[in-house]
């Protein structure tokens, strides 16, 4: 895809399959996927490490895409909930959970701000929230809803240090503090983060 919102398969399947962190993933257009599989496994391993799961937690994963982080965390959590705005990605996430025999995952399609607000008003109190937003970072209302849910930990996967810094500052206003950070070079040999 270069530009546009219509996709046409010219040859072969209209999706890709990949194995990541021991799980099989289906990826349809226009879903996001980390192109550097080896470093993605390092990144997701760090997310799992920072989440510090024991098997009894509920995890909310905002901006879950096709469920890569959500399903990687599902192996170590009691319940995982993924949210994503791209309908084909959510369809793939649900399929990926079934494909990998993961039964403790559920997925919602919609804007992260709307879903976070709805889950918070419904009384969801996750132990851990993971976020992996696009370069623009988190909207203030997403941060407010996450903070209102009161998770013990927020694991923030960022591709833009500037928006990460901005969002950490806002989280601080809600009583959170940054405790750990790790850099993963997703694009070795380039200036990209």
List each language-model region with its residue ranges:
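Rossmann-like S-adenosyl-L-methionine
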Residues: 1-193
